UniProtKB/Swiss-Prot annotation:
Reactions listed under catalytic activity: orotidine 5'-phosphate + H(+) = UMP + CO2
GO MF entry, a single one: orotidine-5'-phosphate decarboxylase activity
Disulfide bond is among the record's keywords: no
Record InterPro entries: Aldolase_TIM (IPR013785), OMPdecase (IPR014732), OMPdecase_bac (IPR047596), OMPdeCOase_dom (IPR001754), RibuloseP-bd_barrel (IPR011060)
Any one Gene Ontology cellular component term annotated for this protein: cytosol
Subunit structure: Homodimer.
One GO BP: 'de novo' UMP biosynthetic process
Function: Catalyzes the decarboxylation of orotidine 5'-monophosphate (OMP) to uridine 5'-monophosphate (UMP).
Protein name: Orotidine 5'-phosphate decarboxylase
Gene from which this protein is expressed: pyrF
A Pfam family hit: OMPdecase
CDD domains recorded: OMP_decarboxylase_like
Superkingdom in the source lineage: Bacteria
Length: 240
């Protein structure tokens, strides 16, 4: 049986991806989920239709916001863009896991509490994809290498598949936060994800936060779907 403390902790660790292309659809999901979800991801789909203003709206309502824009540009541009995000009181922000980009992001963050996350390898990619990009190593080795660089430059965490979470814990001495997308409930469709794990598996592997979109917003009852995922996460948090 899941305790209330485990459920509360699990709720804080669930990030619902607002993968929409207009604000009204995203706003409706937030209303439908109510107090059951406290953390949301705003990505590229909403960026050009008022994503930053919507992030302000969510924060004013007491929600935490993960701004998933995956910044990748010249260092000065990244630094200034990150500084602007910090002024919004964003909780998490992603940048590409390139050393110079991560350094610029850390500088732009300044003294704010915003957490900078380096993107390692997208969960929609597999060994064949990274081979096409010119890498001869395994996905796991590339993820670990980028995480080590993230740790060296002062980034707070990484975005990585739960499949690599255990190795990341081992190679970074538990000093990096791990945020894992590519999460699918048992038996759920993978869609465009190639490296996936269930909520239970991901939490047990060492992920700190889980990002789920379609399993919630495409469900017949999004609120019930979110609650079921939170229960599964809470079960994983309980000691054996």
């Amino acid at each position: 049986m899941t305790g209330s403390h485990d459920s509360d902790l699990a709720r804080e660790k669930l990030i619902v991806a607002l993968d929409y292309w207009n604000i009204e659809d995203a706003r409706k999901l937030v209303r439908d989920l109510g107090d059951g979800v406290s953390f949301y991801k705003v990505g590229l789909g909403l960026q050009l239709v008022g994503g930053n203003e919507f992030a302000r709206e969510l924060i004013a309502e007491g929600k935490r916001v993960f701004l998933d824009y995956k910044y990748y540009d010249i260092e000065e541009t990244v630094q200034r863009a990150v500084a602007q995000a910090a002024e919004l009181k964003i909780a998490f922000l992603t940048v590409h896991g390139v050393t110079s980009i991560m350094k610029a992001a850390v500088a732009g963050r300044g003294n704010s509490d915003m957490k900078i996350l380096g993107v390692t390898v997208l969960t929609s990619m597999d060994a064949e994809d990274i081979k096409e990009m010119g890498f001869e190593c395994s996905v796991e080795d590339l993820v670990v290498a980028r995480a080590r660089r993230a740790l060296e430059v002062g980034v707070d965490g990484v975005v990585a598949s739960a499949l690599e979470a255990a190795e990341l814990r081992k190679h970074t001495n538990n000093k990096l936060m791990i945020v894992s997308p590519g999460i699918r409930p048992s038996g759920g469709a993978r869609h465009d994800q190639k490296r996936v794990a269930t909520p239970f598996e991901a939490m047990r592997a060492g992920a700190d936060y889980l990002v789920l979109g379609r399993p919630i917003y495409a469900a017949d009852n999004p609120k019930a779907a979110a609650q079921a995922i939170i229960r599964e996460m809470a079960d994983a948090l309980r000691p054996d």
